[in-house]
């Protein structure tokens, strides 16, 4: 898309939602292919956000951390259903997945008319990811493997499989798989192509189901299925907490992030996994900025397409993630040096949990506009999944309208929602890092001193995130 809209009244970055005219919006099914708005400077938001994050740290330094830990440990049980329904829900999810694969292979070649790419990239990767931060580990019920696996177990498959994964693998397999997923999403030229996406999704389902049969469901999904690992980590931020019981499960409430403070330290590969999750969504925004395109010698007003930039983008994705990992490691090392700590591995494994609200905030801010627009395309595609002229739900309209988000006032709300998410995510991260640092060091003074470098990093990343939202983009 070559259109560039100039807004001179307000500082705003809203992606594909502001393409005029009002009648309909051209957009791609993949969230990363967003529209472009040239903006007025947003330095006031950046300065205000950085000040808010820094001020939250100063307030925490003045307050005793023990009440914060006690508050985070509070739990309130709200329900104890006599059954969990996991197998049934998962099997239904598998059937929906099979229908989506069929639609991808035989339906429309248009990514905006085929439900498979819209479901994968908008409803699942955007919507379901955000839901995990609010509602808990929904993937435990919605994954398309658990139901078929339970059926296979009833037919005689050993519940624990036949083999065991070496403990030394840790999170290395899912780290590689998540990087492959990020490559497919951000670098591969056609991640939205329905037929190619159907082939990739089917191959991954077969690979995962074979692993589950060989190594058992828990053994495989805890270290070899990247979505299960990623969603389980995000779910620790949720205010809902589910625990299995002999007759079903117990559902309770907890403070947001309370489960992150109590989490066990991640091994180095788990630390790298979380940092890759943040680095990939950050690069998704960075790769289309005029700054990045200029750095790799591309005129942003003559964007050549993803297929010509595969080498540069895979390099950029790796450098972004390694830079973030290096900055995090340096911050943890500096903090441990300040307090005389010696267990750098444990410190990094605990403090990295404070990154989770930042990763979720970036996910919300970066994909919000795509969710609002492409979610409408998804509703239309679901009414005619096989491109046969159906209108199952009365939503199969020829054009998706986005009048709901057009205009200066709507743009103002979108921008402020994005900025609030970035700032709020970093403030919560500072609070969690303070509680984790107290757990790590055992005294308020050592916790504040050890957390200081991490806070500096978070302040800097707040400014970077707000810059990503406001800087001109192309592609």
Predicted features and spans:
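Transmembrane alpha-helix/helix-exit interface in multi-pass inner-membrane proteins
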Residues: 281-290, 325-334, 358-394
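Long, internal scaffold/assembly segments composed of regular secondary structure
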Residues: 221-333
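Juxtamembrane boundary at the C-terminal end of a transmembrane helix
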Residues: 465-475
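Transmembrane-helix bundle segments that line or gate the permeation/cavity pathway
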Residues: 29-37, 44-255, 283-284
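C-terminal substrate/ligand-recognition segments
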Residues: 315-334, 348-371, 414-430, 458-462
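N-terminal secretory/membrane targeting signals
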Residues: 1-29
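Interfacial loop-to-transmembrane junctions
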Residues: 430-458
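Membrane-interface segments at the starts/ends of alpha-helical transmembrane spans
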Residues: 32-48, 110-121, 258-261, 298-315, ...
């Amino acid at each position: 898309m070559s259109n560039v809209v100039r807004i001179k009244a307000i500082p705003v970055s809203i992606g594909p939602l502001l393409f005029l005219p009002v009648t309909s919006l051209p957009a791609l099914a993949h969230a990363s292919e967003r529209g472009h708005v040239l903006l007025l400077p947003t330095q006031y938001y950046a300065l205000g956000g950085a000040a808010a994050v820094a001020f939250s740290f100063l307030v925490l330094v003045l307050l005793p951390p023990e009440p914060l830990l006690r508050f985070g440990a509070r739990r309130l049980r709200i329900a104890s259903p006599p059954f969990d329904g996991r197998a049934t829900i998962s099997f239904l999810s598998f059937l929906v997945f099979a229908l989506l694969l069929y639609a991808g292979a035989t339906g429309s070649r248009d990514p905006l008319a085929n439900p498979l790419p819209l479901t994968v990239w908008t409803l699942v990767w955007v919507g379901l990811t955000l839901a995990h931060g609010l509602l808990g580990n929904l993937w435990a019920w919605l994954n398309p493997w658990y139901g078929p696996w339970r059926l296979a177990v009833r037919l005689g498959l050993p519940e624990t499989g036949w083999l065991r994964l070496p403990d030394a693998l840790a999170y290395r397999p899912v780290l590689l798989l998540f990087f492959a997923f990020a490559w497919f999403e951000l670098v591969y030229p056609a991640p939205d192509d329905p037929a190619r996406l159907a082939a990739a999704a089917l191959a991954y389902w077969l690979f995962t189901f074979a692993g589950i049969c060989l190594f058992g469901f828990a053994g495989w999904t805890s270290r070899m299925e990247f979505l299960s690992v990623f969603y389980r980590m995000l779910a620790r931020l949720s205010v809902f907490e589910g625990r299995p019981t002999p007759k079903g499960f117990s559902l309770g409430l907890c403070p947001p992030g309370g489960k992150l403070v109590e989490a066990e330290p991640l091994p180095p590969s788990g630390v790298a996994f979380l940092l890759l999750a943040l680095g990939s969504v950050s690069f998704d925004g960075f790769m289309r900025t005029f700054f990045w395109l200029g750095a790799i010698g591309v005129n942003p007003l003559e964007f050549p397409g993803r297929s010509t930039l595969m080498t540069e983008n895979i390099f950029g994705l790796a450098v972004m993630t390694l830079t973030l990992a290096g900055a995090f490691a340096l911050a943890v090392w500096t903090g441990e040096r300040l307090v005389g700590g010696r267990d750098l591995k444990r410190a990094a494994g605990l403090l990295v949990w404070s990154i989770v609200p930042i990763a979720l905030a970036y996910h919300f801010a970066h994909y919000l506009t795509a969710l609002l627009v492409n979610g409408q395309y998804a509703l239309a595609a679901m009414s005619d999944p096989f491109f046969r002229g159906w209108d199952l739900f009365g939503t199969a309209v020829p054009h998706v309208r986005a009048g709901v988000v057009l205009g200066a006032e709507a743009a103002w709300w979108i921008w402020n929602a994005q900025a609030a998410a970035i700032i709020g995510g970093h403030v919560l991260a500072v609070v969690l890092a303070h509680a984790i640092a107290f757990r790590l060091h055992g005294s308020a003074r050592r916790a504040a001193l050890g957390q200081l470098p991490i806070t500096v990093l978070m302040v800097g990343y707040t400014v970077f995130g707000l810059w990503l939202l406001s800087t001109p983009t192309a592609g």
